[in-house]
């Protein structure tokens, strides 16, 4: 059992028959009242994100999740195809479970598959991902307000805002947690 006061990002638990991973946890105490914990959690079975509230001191069942290293091969439209790095066995995961992660997956990427009692839940990808910019408009002269940004499209089709100096063909670092620009790659 896990005390909800110990919630922090990455903790997996079972609640009402579902498996969740904590994305963010906010602890608050009201005057003489009891402490509350609000946690933004992801349901690992459905892929949906929700906000759960608990009273301080509540306990939930810990979910022991196995993480298996795999390679991302391709997306066939309804499933992503992954290959086990040891047995070369291929598995499929419904794209609905990994909608956010699809924005960052590139062929051959090393990822972790989360399993609970032999049930494949979803995937875990690196936090910082290097992606090539395939479409970037030129910087417009005179467009220099504080911290000017422009929208670019990376090789996976994901669109994000980056500083004006980023050019087409450059490799940038993107955070898979926030989807935001994290810096220029050294590649």
From Swiss-Prot:
UniProt GO MF annotations: translation elongation factor activity
One GO process term, biological-process aspect: peptide biosynthetic process
SUPFAM superfamilies attached to this UniProt entry: Nucleic acid-binding proteins, Translation proteins SH3-like domain
Listed pathway(s): Protein biosynthesis; polypeptide chain elongation
Localization (cell): Cytoplasm
Disulphide bridges, residue numbers: none
Keywords on record: Cytoplasm, Elongation factor, Protein biosynthesis
InterPro entries xref list: Elong-fact-P_C, NA-bd_OB-fold, Rib_uL2_dom2, Transl_elong_fac_P/YeiP, Transl_elong_KOW-like, Transl_elong_P/YeiP_cen, Transl_elong_P/YeiP_CS, Transl_elongation_fac_P
PROSITE patterns: EFP (PS01275)
One GO CC term on file: cytoplasm
Record bears the keyword Protein biosynthesis: yes
HAMAP family: EF_P
PANTHER family xref list: ELONGATION FACTOR P (PTHR30053), ELONGATION FACTOR P (EF-P) FAMILY PROTEIN (PTHR30053:SF12)
Cited function: Involved in peptide bond synthesis. Stimulates efficient translation and peptide-bond synthesis on native or reconstituted 70S ribosomes in vitro. Probably functions indirectly by altering the affinity of the ribosome for aminoacyl-tRNA, thus increasing their reactivity as acceptors for peptidyl transferase.
NCBIfam families assigned to the protein according to its UniProt record, in alphabetical order: efp, PRK00529.1
Protein family (similarity comment): Belongs to the elongation factor P family.
Protein name: Elongation factor P
Gene encoding the protein: efp
């Amino acid at each position: 059992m896990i005390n909800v006061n110990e919630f922090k990002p990455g903790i997996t638990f079972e609640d009402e028959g579902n498996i969740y991973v904590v994305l963010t946890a906010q602890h608050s105490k009201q005057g003489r009242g009891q402490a509350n914990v609000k946690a933004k959690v992801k349901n690992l079975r459905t892929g949906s994100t929700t906000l759960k509230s608990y009273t301080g001191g509540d306990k939930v069942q810990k979910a022991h999740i196995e993480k298996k290293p795999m390679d991302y091969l391709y997306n066939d439209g309804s499933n992503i195809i992954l290959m086990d790095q040891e047995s070369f066995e291929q598995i499929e995961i419904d794209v609905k479970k990994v909608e956010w992660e699809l924005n960052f997956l590139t062929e051959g990427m090393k990822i972790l598959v989360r399993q609970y009692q032999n049930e494949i839940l979803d995937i875990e990808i690196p936090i910082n991902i290097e992606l090539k910019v395939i479409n970037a408009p030129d910087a417009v002269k005179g467009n220099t307000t504080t911290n000017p940004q422009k929208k670019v499209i990376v090789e996976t089709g994901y669109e994000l805002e980056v500083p004006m100096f980023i050019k087409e063909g450059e490799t940038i670092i993107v955070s898979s947690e926030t989807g935001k620009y994290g810096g220029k790659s050294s590649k």
